[in-house]
Amino acid sequence: MALTDLSAKVVLVDIEGTTTSITFVHDVLFPYAKANAGQYLSETWETDDTKQIVEELTQLPQYTEYASTLETRPEINAAHIADFSRYLIEKDLKVTPLKTLQGHIWAKGYASGELKGHVYEDVAVAFQAWSDAGLRIAVYSSGSVAAQKLIFQHSIAGDLLPLLSAHFDTNVGHKQQTESYTRIAESLGVEPQHVLFLTDVPEEASAARDAGMQTVLLARPGNAPLTAEHTSAFPVVANFVALQSLKQP
């Protein structure tokens, strides 16, 4: 199908490598959380939210592994939990309590103005064009819904949150499983064929297509290179410009 033939009621977008540079997450957000975990935990140690996060972190099997590497029995305090959170980040373990902690740290950073969410220049323009055409825009990312909203609310292009109608994270299912996209379509109240999913990951595009969605791959700077098999299986665009004239069916 040619790009000019595409139509949709909902545009479902991935974040990393699609609306936002992969380097923003790995080079800005993750280091910020690592650098500020100790201070955040110290300041909020007595709050119910932080107590819950600490309890969930210390119940992880990875915590048992981590504690066994220490020379002495650890005291559960802010510094120790901050060290454990850095251990998880360095191992790229995206466990739920860590994502919750990171989300709280990022929220503080966004609120103070230290952090601004990266979006590509064409994203805000396309979002506005799709919204003006009556299309809904939804987000599906492995990052928590709270973290998603922060990126778009505090973006370098301004507050894009009013243009977004729904957010999905791994609570709906993993991104390479077809059932996740079926659930998303049901939640949106549309047939899967009326959803256009934009992602940089071929395995996600394949899962969405198997659910009946239309899919387009993004070849943004810094993204993993696409193989000939991928480029023959899916339409590929360098940015959202070619999709700005998308209309409803």
From Swiss-Prot:
Q: In which pathway does it act?
A: Amino-acid biosynthesis; L-methionine biosynthesis via salvage pathway; L-methionine from S-methyl-5-thio-alpha-D-ribose 1-phosphate: step 3/6; Amino-acid biosynthesis; L-methionine biosynthesis via salvage pathway; L-methionine from S-methyl-5-thio-alpha-D-ribose 1-phosphate: step 4/6
**Which positions in this protein are listed as binding Mg(2+)?**
D14, E16, D200
Give the family per the record: Belongs to the HAD-like hydrolase superfamily. MasA/MtnC family.
According to its UniProt entry, one GO biological process term is: L-methionine salvage from methylthioadenosine
Organism of origin: Drosophila mojavensis (Fruit fly)
Keywords recorded for this protein, A-Z: Amino-acid biosynthesis, Cytoplasm, Hydrolase, Magnesium, Metal-binding, Methionine biosynthesis, Nucleus
Function field: Bifunctional enzyme that catalyzes the enolization of 2,3-diketo-5-methylthiopentyl-1-phosphate (DK-MTP-1-P) into the intermediate 2-hydroxy-3-keto-5-methylthiopentenyl-1-phosphate (HK-MTPenyl-1-P), which is then dephosphorylated to form the acireductone 1,2-dihydroxy-3-keto-5-methylthiopentene (DHK-MTPene).
**Which CDD domains does the entry link to?**
HAD_EP
| InterPro entries given in the database record | Enolase-ppase_E1 (IPR023943), ENOPH1_eukaryotes (IPR027511), HAD-like_sf (IPR036412), HAD-SF_hydro_IA (IPR006439), HAD_sf (IPR023214)
Q: What is this protein called?
A: Enolase-phosphatase E1
Q: What's the source species' lineage? A: Eukaryota, Metazoa, Ecdysozoa, Arthropoda, Hexapoda
